[in-house]
Each structure stands twice: as C-alpha cells, then as structure tokens.
UniProtKB/Swiss-Prot annotation:
This is Isopentenyl-diphosphate delta-isomerase. FMN binds at T62, G63, M64, T65, S93, N122, K189, S214, T219, G272, I273, R274, A293, L294. Involved in the biosynthesis of isoprenoids. Catalyzes the 1,3-allylic rearrangement of the homoallylic substrate isopentenyl (IPP) to its allylic isomer, dimethylallyl diphosphate (DMAPP). The gene is fni. The lineage of its organism: Archaea, Thermoproteota, Thermoprotei, Desulfurococcales, Desulfurococcaceae. CDD domains: IDI-2_FMN.
Amino acid sequence: METSNRKLDHLRITLLEDVEAGDTWLDFVKVPHRAVPELNLEEVVTEIEVFGKKLSAPLIVTGMTGGNEHAAKINAVIAEVVEELGLGMGVGSQRAAVERPELEWTFRIARERAPNALLIANLGAPQLLKGYGLEEIKKAIDMIDADAIAIHLNAAQESFQPEGDVDYKGLLNKLSELVDKVEKPIIIKETGAGLDYESVKALRELGIKAFDVSGSGGTSWVRVEMYRAREKGDEVLATVADWMSSWGIPTAASIMEARAAAPDALVIASGGIRDGLHAVKSLALGADLVGVALPALKAAYEGKEELKKFLKSMMLSIKIGLFLTGSPAPEHIKGKAIVLGPLKEWALERGIYEEWLRAR
C-alpha cells in the first residue's frame, strides 16, 4: 500500500476507534506534597531550553501525522497553537514526502504556521536499513526547517503490517555511521512499546543524546493495525494483534529505564500522557520533557480553541505541580518521585533501581 494512503488509514482509525491499550503504570508513581512549599506560585518558572529553542513549559506535541491533506490541516492547527503558546511539536513520519515531493507541503505547513517554535522532523529506522542516509535525513530536516529529527522505532507495529518493514538487523551500525554527520540532534523515539535500558545504553554509547520513550499505556499501534487487518479481512493477523495490543514497557517503567541507561541524555516522557498529573509524575521520575499525541490530535481535530484549552490546562498543571512539591523550576522536581507496587518490582527485577536513583 502507498505510504500516504496508509497514513490516512492511521489518522482515520486513531480518531474514530478505540486505539488505547496497556497501562502506563503512572498510578504507581507518587510525588510527595510539600505542605510548606516556601514558594510563590506566581514566581514558579516553567520555561526550559531544548535544542536551542526556549519553551514556555516542558511540553511538546509529539509526531503522529502528515502526508495527506487531512493530516496537513491538523498539523497546521497544532503548529498555530504551539507557536502561540511557546511550545513545540513533532510531525509524523516524512517518508511519504521524501519519496513524493508533492506531499512536502503537508509537513512544511507546520513551519509556515510556527516560524519560531521547536519543530522535530521524523523518519523511520527501517528506512535507514533500506537505503536512506544523510541525503534523506537532510531532506526531512530541511522540509520543515527542523530543530531536531526523530528516528522512530516501530518494530511492534511493523510486525502487524502486511507491508511492514521487519528487518532491524544492523541498525546500530547504520546509526553509528550517521550520528556525527547529521547537522541536527537525533532523537530516538519509540512508538507505543517503550524504550528499554539495553537499547538506550547502546544508543547512548553511539553518541545519541535524546530519547522519546513512547511507552505502553496510550495509543497502541498494534491495535491500530488490528483494525486495518480486520478491514482487509485478515482475521489471523487481526486476532494476533488483538492478543498483543498491550505489548510493551509501561511508560513509567520506560522513563526509569531510559534515565538509568543515559543519565546525561534528554528524556522525553510520552505514551499515555493524558493529563497534567501524568506530566508532573513523569517529570518527577526524571523526564526532561513531556510529550502528548492522541489527546492533542483529537483536540486539534475539533479545532484550534479546543487544542489551546487542552495544552493550557497541561501547562497550568505542571506549574501547580512544581509549586506543590517546592520546585521553583522543572529541574528541581527530578528525583522527587516515589515508585510503588509493580513499578518498583519491575525496576528491582530489571536491576535498574539503584542506577535510576542515582541518575534521576
């Protein structure tokens, strides 16, 4: 199937169907309340700098869409709002536009509507193993004048696509050839199944300095592919996708894994971040930045004001969360999370708990 048509399928399904599965485990994260915060709420600072761009809060809309007219309209709405609020955004995979230049405008519109915002380009890891190199990466970056590029990992999703790219052999070698040659920072981004300690450590050793965990508990791209398989009459593939739709590392655990493996890296918490409390807990776990996708996509589909209301609510939640923990700025809330139940058991069984304590 042509890439742009597949992306249209994905957009339609994520907007209309129940595509969430798994559990973020953020319910097993507690952040102690500071009864005497010794702060003035109005003086709490939420601004941070990421890739040379100042953000008014540690919050971005992570990439989900592009490559067709409907996606372009959504990207335009998101771009206008993040520009107005001083936030950032990523676009969905740009493969379709790299291969068909007439689709570039569906992504470029993001920079046109957000001339000053942090923008993150996006290409898939499997394409790097099928011939993509510096030329295609540069094309994706230049297309939206991006400040960074996400290389997304989606082995789980690809496993359930009849046309899926399931050869990941040699990816580390390929990335090692590119990491020092790409002009902009590279973000390694999962897509709903979470980043693990071993992968992050290996990637950090290559020189990668930014990771978007995109853990389980939010949008399940396996579940999205389940709907596509049903529509095509492939009941075997649909059944297996249904069984495995909750596959992945819960977002809270993935934040801990990434932070333990790469104490000095930028860690973006995403995957099932649905409200401001989730954002505060993610920052307390050790994330530098919080990413939202599906709720922002659905709000943008309703219109600019709906998205603005959602993002402003997230921003205010973060500010109040910092205040209530005695944290004058985002970096001060790191290390204040207490992890309980299966999340702590996971960290102990995985042998990352002590490293996480030191790194957060």
